[in-house]
């Protein structure tokens, strides 16, 4: 059964406490990545209704630090489903609830694999993108997947047709 991308949306909110920060009072990157992994896993599970495991995390760049006492908002949504894997796009914002403003902190792509009861990969539902953003993310997901597979040594560069097309247009 195909499912809408919007059906997988997870919004997670956390308050940055002293134990979450480094000596500069900024949210530690590892703590944010932990929260992002949870949000992405929940989005993947909503999509496939099965246990999932993290297969990969794309490059994460931290644009703006999130300070102690600020709020972290994480949005996670499945962008595309393949045979047993799903790409999840995450957007992260910080919010100063006292000053009443939000700012973008970062975004990333995670890949999850659905598992059957024996722990083996199992097929997942296809995604139906509806909004323009969902369609763009869906269309570009195959290129990102091929790059991940090449970097992980699971695909030869000469077999990456979508990726090669970027350089031959």
Give the predicted meaning of each segment:
Residues 2, 16-17:
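Membrane engagement elements in two modes
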Residues 6-12, 67-68, 79-169:
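HotDog/MaoC-like acyl-thioester-processing domains
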Residues 21-33, 166-169:
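A conserved, well-ordered hydrophobic junction motif at loop->secondary-structure transitions
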Residues 32, 36, 40-44:
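Buried hydrophobic packing segments
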Residues 2-7, 27, 41-75, 79-80, ...:
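Hydrophobic beta-strand-centered segment that forms part of the acyl-chain substrate-binding groove
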Residues 17-18, 63:
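Residue-level recognition of the GNAT/N-acetyltransferase active site
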Residues 14-16, 47:
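Short, small-residue-rich loop/turn micro-motifs
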């Amino acid at each position: 059964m195909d499912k809408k991308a919007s059906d997988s949306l997870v919004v997670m909110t956390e308050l940055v406490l002293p134990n979450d920060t480094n000596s500069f009072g900024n949210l530690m990157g590892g703590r944010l990545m932990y929260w992002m992994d949870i949000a992405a896993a929940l989005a993947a599970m909503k999509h496939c209704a099965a246990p999932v495991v993290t297969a990969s995390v794309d490059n994460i760049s931290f644009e703006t630090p999130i300070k102690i006492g600020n709020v972290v908002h994480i949005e996670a949504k499945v962008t595309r489903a393949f045979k047993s894997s799903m790409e999840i796009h995450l957007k992260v914002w910080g919010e100063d609830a006292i000053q009443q403003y939000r700012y973008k902190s970062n975004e990333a792509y995670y890949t999850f694999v659905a598992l059957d009861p024996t722990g083996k990969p199992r097929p997942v539902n296809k995604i139906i993108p509806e909004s323009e953003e969902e369609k763009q993310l869906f269309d570009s997901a195959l290129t990102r997947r091929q790059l991940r597979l090449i970097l992980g040594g699971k695909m030869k560069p000469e077999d990456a047709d979508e990726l090669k097309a970027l350089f031959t247009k």
